[in-house]
């Protein structure tokens, strides 16, 4: 939609030719007599009636052209509104029989005593270190949430409801697992025999005391199902799963405080973007309606409108990944954010999570002399903790930040799927642009006008909704967990 504002770039660039371009051209031609020829004929005859006929013909031609334009606009509007209805997201990524088609890959059950990942439970690659026991009088007790999912059976031997208490992340993964269990074995429900423990019935170092672990089984107590139950727990997103015995499965998760960088993808507020006017602005000052430098689907630089902020919080402390290139560019971004990576050996452009970009990989960086995107080698990958997060969304779904081309999306390992998921917001922005009050909702250089970007604080409701449902419709291999 923004391709008519492309910045000049050599079409011979390999990443431009490697990018897929889908074009839809509509050619409407009106076969009408040329008014100029009619006018010349009328002038030659000198007939007044012919002049009147010529004027009438011109008016009819103008009216016809306006009707053609109006009908074409109406047709395009209908097509844009109906296009999302022709897709069914569950068909491409449903994890179970209840959503879309069946899994294309086979899931193998765990064997007795097997753990996934094959690490210590307390390593950062698993559930992470202990943070301390939570008691009823502890300040952190308010962070535990009860789980009243009707698809889950809680044994609750103590009769205090303690087995229903857990961290938010544990509750989220447990609900996903309960859904998978019902899909895998109709009529069977998930059974939780232990969650948060306040009676010290486990070892001294147990995540049960923090509400980060659950002991589970199936409602029919059929041991032959437990290997697959463990596998389903892995797919549900538990950070550490152990087929600990023939009677139950043990699962645990990272602490809620340690996974904040995984729930969204953002840049630092002081990172900059280039506006169409030629001005470079910090992302903290970018507003809805600004047109910033992005990368089109054909790999070329293009200016695209900011339609919303998926996250914006200038006070939140966050962990970031720093990517340094041999040309001096530095991109600071959250670990789950998608970055465009160029593979010269395959002549292919991919999107990779920021924390999976390695040294010697190539990223696309804007050349200040030509304005073109050129590959630069990553020479160092570091980490930093900084204050503030900003995540603008453009119509293109990409943005050039600190001269480095990046996606606007995160968490989901597919640029195209993430872009499709935000299609309703692009359509909504298009409809809002047709409203008379459009200018009141956009940024303005006039004093006293406060942009919507300055009013937003936190995750956008639609982005938050997508994050909550992703575990139900996407396999774990597609997610940044």
Curated annotation (Swiss-Prot):
Disulphide linkage map: none
GO molecular function: calcium ion binding; cholesterol-protein transferase activity; morphogen activity; patched binding; peptidase activity
Any single GO BP term: intein-mediated protein splicing
Compartmental location: Nucleus; Cytoplasm
Site-annotated residues for Essential for auto-cleavage: 337
GO cellular component: cytoplasm; extracellular space; nucleus; plasma membrane
Binding-site list for Ca(2+) 1: 157-158, 163, 193-194
Top-rank taxon: Eukaryota
Protein name: Protein hedgehog
């Amino acid at each position: 939609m923004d391709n008519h504002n492309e910045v000049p770039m050599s079409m011979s660039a390999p990443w431009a030719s490697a990018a897929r371009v889908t074009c839809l051209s509509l050619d409407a031609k009106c076969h009408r007599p040329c008014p100029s020829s009619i006018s010349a004929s009328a002038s030659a005859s000198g007939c007044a009636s012919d002049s009147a006929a010529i004027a009438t013909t011109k008016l009819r031609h103008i009216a016809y052209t306006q009707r053609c334009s109006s009908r074409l606009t109406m047709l395009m509007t209908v097509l844009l509104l109906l296009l999302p209805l022709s897709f069914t997201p569950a068909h491409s990524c449903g994890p179970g029989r209840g959503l879309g088609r069946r899994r294309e890959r086979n899931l193998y059950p765990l064997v007795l005593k097997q753990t996934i990942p094959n690490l210590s439970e307390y390593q950062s690659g698993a559930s992470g270190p202990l943070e301390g026991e939570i008691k009823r009088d502890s300040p952190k007790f308010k962070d535990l949430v009860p789980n009243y999912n009707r698809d889950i059976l809680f044994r609750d031997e103590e009769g205090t409801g303690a087995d229903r208490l857990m961290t938010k992340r544990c509750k989220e993964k447990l609900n996903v697992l309960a859904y998978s269990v019902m899909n895998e074995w109709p009529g069977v429900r998930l059974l939780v025999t232990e969650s948060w423990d306040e009676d010290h019935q486990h070892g001294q170092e147990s995540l049960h005391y923090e509400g980060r672990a659950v002991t589970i089984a199936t409602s029919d107590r059929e041991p032959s199902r437990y290997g697959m139950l463990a596998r389903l727990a892995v797919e549900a997103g538990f950070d550490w799963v152990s087929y600990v015995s023939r009677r139950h499965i043990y699962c645990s998760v990272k602490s809620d405080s340690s996974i904040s960088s995984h729930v969204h993808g953002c840049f630092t507020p002081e990172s900059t973007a280039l506006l169409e006017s030629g001005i470079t602005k910090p992302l903290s000052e970018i507003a809805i309606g600004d047109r910033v430098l992005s990368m089109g689907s054909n790999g070329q630089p293009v200016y695209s409108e900011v339609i919303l902020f998926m996250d914006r919080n200038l006070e939140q402390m966050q962990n970031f990944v720093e990517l340094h290139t041999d040309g001096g560019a530095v991109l600071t971004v959250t670990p789950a954010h998608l970055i465009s990576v160029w593979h010269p050996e395959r002549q292919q452009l991919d999107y990779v999570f920021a924390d999976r970009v390695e040294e010697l990989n190539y990223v696309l960086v804007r050349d200040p002399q030509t304005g073109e995107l050129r590959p630069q080698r990553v020479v160092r990958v570091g980490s930093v903790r900084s204050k503030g997060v900003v995540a603008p969304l453009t119509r293109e779904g990409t943005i050039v930040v600190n001269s480095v081309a990046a996606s606007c999306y995160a968490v989901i390992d597919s640029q195209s799927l993430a872009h499709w998921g935000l299609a309703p917001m692009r359509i909504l922005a298009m409809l809002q642009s047709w409203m008379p009050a459009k200018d009141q909702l956009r940024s303005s250089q006039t004093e006293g006008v406060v942009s919507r970007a300055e009013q937003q604080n936190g995750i956008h409701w639609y982005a938050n909704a997508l994050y909550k449902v992703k575990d139900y419709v996407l396999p774990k291999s597609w997610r940044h967990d």
